[in-house]
Every structure is written in structure tokens, then in C-alpha cells.
């Protein structure tokens, strides 16, 4: 992502600054001197113009009119433009009046040309108007009977035995339209075929049935925030108000309503925060409940704005604030109750014979003879009466053995002779054979001078490879 740099604003010109700050009297000296023409260069020209006549060159601090001759335009030349002139109209000649003719127009003296208009009608009689009425007793009858004709009605019924919709079977209906009667009857025997259906899904409730007609095909899980990464500063908050009033740790304002499960944004954080750990915080994200080392932890992520660039970019660290609510108690252990009473110290043998179990208590004794000792084992007995019921029970399957130890005769083990066998010792230059008479013997001294070789033992693998 390429960072966009903020566009620099153009500074105001000298004339704009002079027009705004002159009335208030806060103009800098260089602005006033440049606009009013009192700079050092202007003063040098004024002093030099007292003794030097520059004529009409227009050099100096005058009004800028170009002197007496004015400015001479640069460039010039070229053909002059052609001016279009319209043709002249001929003059209108007006006849002159003679001085002997009067200039007064006489009025029309003959009034016979005036017409008075149409004459006014005259009415005779004083009885007024006569009103006559007429009544008719015969009603108006409109003949709307159609002309006589023959109407032929034909119908076609096609039955499909593979598909018959039950709601389409309705009761017979009749209709009357201008002396034409239509009566439709539906009757007949409809056969059907029974097809064995298989149940693909049972009605056993597993607790995971969808609650909508189009359930979501997959379960979308939100990745848990990595609160303990190296990019976050871990800060522990011991004040329990951090759960219900987190904004009081950043600003001194007391809002009327503060949501708990939403993110909080601070437009202008205070220069001095109520809690030093929350200095320069501009955003506190929504909380999260996690379990950490056997505790229930309330966490919020915070964003600081320690630095601000000219482009408006805010730079700051990310902090993880957490508060331990309580510890998670260990799971309750259920106390198991014995199936049998403590008085009857019997064990149940799962391999006991059913015929022997019906006789009551069986106490067989099996003795195995051994040399110099005897071991006897007593098999456990079985109680056939167990009618008590318990909520939490245990079934002991272990058996106990009674092993009596008896003393036997002493066993004498063979011992080695206490005197070492005699081996004749001769000089080295004489060759003699070595006679072994006992468990210990001397090797021929010449064998010590021979080179010792490593004994190679071959190893055979299952694939037939021999390794040395």
C-alpha cells in the first residue's frame, strides 16, 4: 500500500497579509515596507533621484504611468484589421407644407353615419310563462334475449394413472348462463400402485437439527485474537471498574450511558489521564472473555496515538489491558459408594460358575505342591443375594490371595576349591604345551605379541542383505 502525502497549502501573498493585518496592527515590518515602498532599495532610489534627472524613463518610485510619453508597447507591426462598413441608405424626402393651407384638421359634422344598433324587443301580456308536464306509465323494457341458436358443448377427459392430484377432485358444479345449462360430473375408479419406501433419516433428536429451512452448510468460526503476541504491551488492571466503566480510566468525563460490549473511540484524549497506563489512548476495542492459567480474564485492546504526523497519521503502541475476574474452581469429584456392605468382605468373580453360584457360598481351596515349599490359594466366595440399588457404585473385580510360606530343608550349593591349581612355569625359549587343570589357566606368552584384530560379526536383515 502506497502512502499518500498530504498536499501543502499555498501561503498567502504579501498583499493579502497586508490587507488583513493592517487594520489590526499586527503586520510584520518586512510586509509593511514592501507594500508601502519603504524598503532600503526604495530609499536609495529616492535619495539618488534628488540629484539625478532620469527624464521620462520612468525609473523611480513614481506612480508608474511611464512618464510624459507613456509606455511604448513591445513588438508591433503587422497588417491593420479591416473594418466592415454597411452601405448607406438613401434619404427619405418629405414634402413640405405650404404656408397658405391651414394646419387644423376639421371634425366630421354629419352625424347620420352613426348607427344606434338593434331595436329592443317588446313583451305583451302580464300572466307570465305557462309550464306544461307530461307523464308516462309504461316502463321501458329492453329486450336482451339473444337470438335463438344451437350451442354444442364438448369436453375431453384424459386420465394419467401415474400422477393424480387429490385436490383437483372437486364436487360437481353447475352454471347458468342465458338459458344454457352446463353440468359436469366426475366419477370412476382410480387404481394406484404401492411402492415400498425406505426411511433415509430417523426422527431421533440429536440436538443438532437446523432451525431454518436453509441452514448454513458450514460453521464459520471467528479466529480468536492473539492477545499475547509480541506486538502488544501487557498491562494488568486491578480496578474492577474497568469492566463496567472503562472510559473513566482515559478521560474525566462521566457519560450518562456507556455500552459495555462495543468499541469506544475518544476524539480528543486528555493530556493527563486519570490512570497513567491509559495515557494517549484513542480507541478501546470491545471486550473478550478468555481463560488464562486457571482464571477467567476480561481483556480489551487499546490503541495509543503518541505521535501525529502532518499528514494526519497517528502512530502509537498497541496495549492489551486485562483484569482477572476469578479463578476457575476444580471439577467436583463424585464420591463412589461400594456395591456391597463393609461387613461382607466378598469379591465378585466374573468367571464363577452359575451352578455353583446357586448353592450359596462356595469356598474351595486349591493347593499346588512345589519342591521345598507349598503354596495354597483360597478362591473368593460369591454372594448371590445383591438386591440393593445405589446411584454411584463400584464393582471390585480384584481378588486376594493368601500365600503361606513354610520352612524347608537347607540346600547346600556346590563351592569352588579354595586352592588354585598348580601350573608349571618354564622359560620362554622352551616350547611346551599348556595343560588346563582347573578353572583358571595361563596363556602362552607368545600370544600377547600377536596383533589383535577386530572380530567381524555379520548381521542378516529380513531383506537378505548382509552387513558387516
Swiss-Prot record:
Any Gene Ontology biological process: viral penetration into host nucleus
GO CC term, one of those recorded: host cell Golgi apparatus
Localization annotation: Virion; Host nucleus; Host early endosome; Host Golgi apparatus
Motif (Nuclear localization signal): 1-12, 449-457
GO molecular function per UniProt: DNA binding; structural molecule activity
Post-translational note: Highly phosphorylated.
Keywords on record: Capsid protein, Cytoplasmic inwards viral transport, Disulfide bond, DNA-binding, Host endosome, Host Golgi apparatus, Host nucleus, Host-virus interaction, Late protein, Microtubular inwards viral transport, Phosphoprotein, Viral penetration into host nucleus, Virion, Virus entry into host cell
Disulfide bonds: 21-27
Domain of life: Viruses
A Pfam family annotated for this UniProt entry: Late_protein_L2
Signal sequence range: none
Function: Minor protein of the capsid that localizes along the inner surface of the virion, within the central cavities beneath the L1 pentamers. Plays a role in capsid stabilization through interaction with the major capsid protein L1. Once the virion enters the host cell, L2 escorts the genomic DNA into the nucleus by promoting escape from the endosomal compartments and traffic through the host Golgi network.
Family statement drawn from the similarity comment of this UniProt entry: Belongs to the papillomaviridae L2 protein family.
Entry-linked HAMAP family: PPV_L2
Listed name of the protein: Minor capsid protein L2
Species of origin: Human papillomavirus 51
Amino acid at each position: 500500500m502506497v502512502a499518500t502525502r498530504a498536499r501543502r497549502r499555498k501561503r498567502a501573498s504579501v498583499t493579502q497579509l497586508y490587507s488583513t493585518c493592517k487594520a489590526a496592527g499586527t503586520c510584520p515590518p518586512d510586509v509593511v515596507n514592501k507594500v508601502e515602498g519603504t524598503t532600503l532599495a526604495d530609499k536609495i532610489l529616492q535619495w539618488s533621484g534628488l540629484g539625478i534627472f532620469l527624464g521620462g524613463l520612468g525609473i523611480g518610485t513614481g506612480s508608474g504611468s511611464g512618464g510624459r510619453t507613456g509606455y511604448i508597447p513591445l513588438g508591433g507591426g503587422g497588417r491593420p484589421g479591416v473594418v466592415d462598413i454597411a452601405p448607406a441608405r438613401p434619404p427619405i424626402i418629405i414634402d413640405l407644407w405650404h404656408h397658405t393651407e391651414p394646419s387644423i384638421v376639421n371634425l366630421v359634422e354629419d352625424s347620420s353615419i352613426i348607427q344606434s344598433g338593434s331595436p329592443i324587443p317588446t313583451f305583451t301580456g302580464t300572466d307570465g310563462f305557462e309550464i306544461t308536464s307530461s307523464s308516462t306509465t309504461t316502463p321501458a323494457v329492453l329486450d336482451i334475449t339473444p337470438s335463438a341458436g344451437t350451442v354444442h358443448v364438448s369436453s375431453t377427459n384424459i386420465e394419467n394413472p401415474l400422477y393424480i392430484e387429490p385436490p383437483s377432485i372437486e364436487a360437481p358444479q353447475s352454471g347458468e348462463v342465458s338459458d344454457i345449462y352446463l353440468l359436469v360430473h366426475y366419477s370412476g375408479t382410480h387404481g394406484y400402485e404401492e411402492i415400498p419406501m425406505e426411511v433415509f433419516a430417523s426422527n431421533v433428536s440429536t440436538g443438532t437439527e437446523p432451525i431454518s429451512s436453509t441452514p448454513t452448510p458450514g460453521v464459520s468460526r471467528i479466529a480468536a485474537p492473539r492477545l499475547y503476541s509480541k506486538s502488544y504491551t501487557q498491562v494488568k488492571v486491578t480496578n474492577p471498574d474497568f469492566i463496567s466503566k472503562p472510559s473513566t480510566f482515559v478521560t474525566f468525563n462521566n457519560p450518562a450511558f456507556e455500552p459495555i460490549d462495543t468499541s469506544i473511540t475518544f476524539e480528543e484524549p486528555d493530556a493527563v489521564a486519570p490512570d497513567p497506563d491509559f495515557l494517549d489512548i484513542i480507541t478501546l476495542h470491545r471486550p473478550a472473555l478468555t481463560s488464562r492459567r486457571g482464571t477467567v480474564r476480561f481483556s480489551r485492546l487499546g490503541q495509543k496515538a503518541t505521535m501525529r504526523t502532518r499528514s494526519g497519521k497517528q502512530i502509537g503502541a498497541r496495549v492489551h489491558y486485562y483484569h482477572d475476574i476469578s479463578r476457575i474452581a476444580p471439577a467436583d469429584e463424585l464420591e463412589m459408594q461400594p456395591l456391597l456392605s463393609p461387613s461382607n468382605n466378598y469379591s465378585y468373580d466374573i468367571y464363577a460358575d452359575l451352578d455353583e453360584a446357586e448353592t450359596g457360598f462356595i469356598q474351595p481351596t486349591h493347593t499346588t505342591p512345589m519342591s521345598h515349599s507349598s503354596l495354597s490359594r483360597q478362591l473368593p466366595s460369591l454372594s448371590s443375594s445383591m438386591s440393593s440399588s445405589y446411584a454411584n457404585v463400584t464393582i471390585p473385580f480384584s481378588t486376594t490371595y493368601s500365600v503361606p510360606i513354610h520352612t524347608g530343608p537347607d540346600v547346600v550349593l556346590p563351592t569352588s576349591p579354595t586352592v588354585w591349581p598348580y601350573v608349571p612355569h618354564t622359560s620362554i625359549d622352551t616350547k611346551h604345551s599348556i595343560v588346563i587343570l582347573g578353572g583358571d589357566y595361563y596363556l602362552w606368552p607368545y600370544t600377547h605379541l600377536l596383533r589383535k584384530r577386530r572380530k567381524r560379526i555379520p548381521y542378516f536383515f529380513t531383506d537378505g542383505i548382509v552387513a558387516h
